[in-house]
């Protein structure tokens, strides 16, 4: 009979050699079985040089385990059973996540803490492969999990009085290995903070008289994270620092083992890291032998066993305690973190630098994706409008000749501004989300806050070959005389072709005047994170803290994190605060974490300038006139620091003059005035060139150019006055039964514009519907008037200022070019009637005697209103727009004073096998301080738009579209639909204001990532064409989440004819044709017809000269919205 000492030394001493460790969170089917601790009988002699139990599946077995189409057995959820990852392929069984419980296999399971699995193959009687895998229930050919021992429970309580006590205050995860089974540490036992939990101890009745084996995770690691087949990235699972084991022999003696984990010692990094917790075995009774038994990391780290303890396989120390029945034992988990931290505080490996201004802020810690949160204090209850847009592209469109586009390339995240010759101003930022396409991970993020706008951009590597084309069509149709109106069913119809993809569309039409808040604060946050040895950081920060806002502040943050490499960050930031801020402050932080492999340097160029201007408008009621003036100056200086740099230092100056006159007439009447201010600048451009190289890779960063073009300010004031007893109405049409023709036109204005290339007319109208039946459109409005007051007014001011930054970056491993351009525009001193729709309805708002009333879904919202736009984004977030508007006045004086700062860095970085790039951000802002003699009404309205293009060209499929307009048809100006595609959808979409003729932006992308776009238009006879290159064979799927809103301004036409065709240029087949002739009549209706074309995949082998089949043709979903226009007599 073996002696007690022999039994003690034999507890869990068999260790197998290390083999492959999988990178998955659990070990997958087919991995080599190992955890370096053999579950051997503890009362039999075992040579310490026991041969490794290295078990592998063959290919046939892997296919059998992973096949999903065979018969599978469901997890029974019996008494005391615990499901392991029930949402994975194992469906709750104690197996690898991608291993299935299929017919003809044994499926082990986990039990609650203190309980053991009571079922296994009765014929599996030895610890040899594959018998050691046959635990749990047998899955028969009918898909039923069968008990091999019908009279025994699924789970039964263990023996021995052994428990775990947590003294760390964070809780401990003990993870038991599955045997018989794949021996992964999947069976969870959670010891709550400062509590005690029983451990399951098997006796000789358990399978093959084997012991229970546990991995002891660090404090605070959950069983979800710790009871897995881990990796060396974290000391969890089979990489945990400590192991424990327990069993009872035939003499009812319980043996408990504590020791170091050999796999933890194998790792060159973890073997040098001392855990901050230890294990100690305590007995209550007089039969314990083998004490003291502990693992104390304070001196020797994970090898902190008592002096003289035996050494097992892998050089791991251990100790064993045995005790008889009647004695209880506890494994106490001890916290040494504070004691070890105080003794090694000088060995901290984190380097952090920070600079603080008048207020303290928290350090920005290194992370792969950081989005800053910017808070703007309000001015007062009557002059603030703030918008918050989450996970959406955003654009502020001030004038009517803009197309704002955001493009994403395969290895870059770029925001680009495209403007027509008559454009005013636009701010564009986009959200790009891509996954990694190589072995490393790289991401960048930037967050910008501007007056009334808060947005964010994030980007990571991803691409998907999808292509989408939008065509927006606006035309006028002759409907006959008043006696034969078209019914609502024919106007509001929806045409849908057969489609494999369900696409839901909706749209709304509204009329509003864009305005902006007086001023807000702005700040910039930029960060970049590299993984492994891929290092690239280029941060550009600029902050302007503007005046007239109480408690305004601005912050600049820059952070960098590098793994397995080093960088040094030298960043220069600048900020300026103007006067009129009761409590203004700024703070800056620069943080960097680095190692000792190599270094890189980031240098920067800083620029600062000041501007000031004053304006005053005085109203003289006696003469019904207003006069005013605006004057100001500005200066700009540039300085640079950094190696190999050269620059020019221009000085710019500008002068602004203007005047205004206002003529009032009796009510009701139109009162309008136009004020134009033009600013000219001198030497308003600067060039900065910097070259730098890192060791061995000879990379370069050069050619940075900054420009500041001429600024133009245009202000236009218009309003309508109503009588005390009636609402202003130009046209009224009686309600007809069954149709939607009962509209009252409240206000109609006509204007003409021409820029030398295109020309056209626009008509805007604001209408209310008097239909007693359910409206067919999403447009409703109402107005009330008790005393002579303004029923509708608009004062809009736009400031156009565009800045651009172009940079290129190259490396010998991979070559990419990155171009970024960002403009941030503020609209100043604006007051307007504003209407913002939702998905299902549209809200109209008017001024009344009480100041402002918002009518939204039948609810009077008082002085403020908010509207939510639905968004089916991955995070479930919604875009929320809010505004506060007060009663407008015509008498006010203003002064303008502000300053602007720029920070334009260049960088040189080391690149080891992955692509990195640099990006720059430039911020331009202007400020205004009102001195109010009475309340000033301000509001803001923004239209979001974005476009992206990313396709791979294989077998191209080309379509062309053309439209022809004859005679004197006036151009139609439309704010096209705003679409927020899925974040994972990489497609070609376009939104924004389009020109008079319907044009389709085109883009092609070859494997070299080249892009091109072409459109053409003319004033009288206009044609436009585009070519679309589609990837084949590629499945193209379009998932449209929502339309936000549509704004249309449409003009009456006279005797035009329009033909619109879409042609498959490969087969020369006309896919779609519209030809409409017009006859001038006393009544005219206009609707917007928007069509989404989806191009399904067309295999190269199925191409023919005939028209594509219905399944491969585009799928169209159309919606119609109607706007009633003022009737016009025939010529």
UniProtKB/Swiss-Prot annotation:
One of its GO terms (molecular function) is beta-glucosidase activity. GO terms for biological process: cell wall organization; polysaccharide catabolic process. Its EC number is 3.2.1.-. It is found in: Secreted. Residues 1-23 form the signal peptide. One of its GO terms (cellular component) is fungal-type cell wall. It comes from the Eukaryota. Residues 716-725, 738-763 have a biased composition (Polar residues). Pfam families: SUN (PF03856). This is Probable secreted beta-glucosidase adg3. It comes from Schizosaccharomyces pombe (strain 972 / ATCC 24843).
